[in-house]
Amino acid sequence: MCDDGSADNTYEVALEYKNKYPDKIVLLKNEKNMGLNYTLNRCLEAAKGEFIARMDGDDISLPTRFEKEIDFLINNSQFAVVSAPMIMFDENGEWGRTSVIERPQINDFCTHSPFFAHAVCMMKKSVFDEVGGYTVDPKFLRVEDCNLWFKVYAHGYKGANLTEPLYMMRDDRNATHRRSIKARINGCYVVYDGFKMLHMPWYKYFYVVKNTVIELAKCLIPVSLYEYIHKRKFRGGHN
């Protein structure tokens, strides 16, 4: 657990749990806010296990998540990362779920996003170390997961998705407002950069243009309309 320069009593609360479970929790603290990418890398450096799992605040890992992800990685050594569908919920309860491609190939990077749900993923620590962890660069803020998947595949590794939802992600009105214009521009850049890493043929870059137009268009439509489209997309379990 790492406190990234919080201004409230977050660290004190975390310290209580650290003192209660000293053999289970490693507590870190940044002197100032360093951002998610840097903080994730700091946690990776402190981690000693064979596998790395993560989750986001306010979300819920279902009881069998770790068991099923560890079992998959142990019994399918050809895969470096595993993820799963997520159930979406807000203050009114469950309202949708994400869809997945079970065995994403490089060409799927052109048609399906996200390739793996970051919050519910589990990955081999050795692969994290080999690809250099998360890229600490302003161009990859809020899109660190997408950049990570490109790096994993560029190093010759593969990932897989289980078909059973193992995670519940809070996705409410506040979540809709979080994605800024800067984050959307970063989202366009990370795809372009990833295609270069994977040495995609020139005609695949038409997807980069298409993705850029779509992402920037989302900045122009009213929030209420975007919320409607967003929820309609996930209610059917389609990305």
Where do the protein language model's features map onto the residues?
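Short aromatic/hydrophobic "clamp" motif used to bind/position activated sugar donors
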Residues: 52
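Non-catalytic, C-terminal membrane-associated alpha-helical segments of glycosyltransferases
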Residues: 175-239
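A conserved acidic beta->alpha catalytic loop
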Residues: 3-12, 32, 56
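Conserved donor NDP-sugar-binding/catalytic core segment of glycosyltransferases
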Residues: 64-96
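Glycine-rich, basic loop-to-helix element that forms the pyrophosphate-binding segment
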Residues: 30-47, 68
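The conserved acidic donor/metal-binding loop of glycosyltransferases
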Residues: 56-60, 85
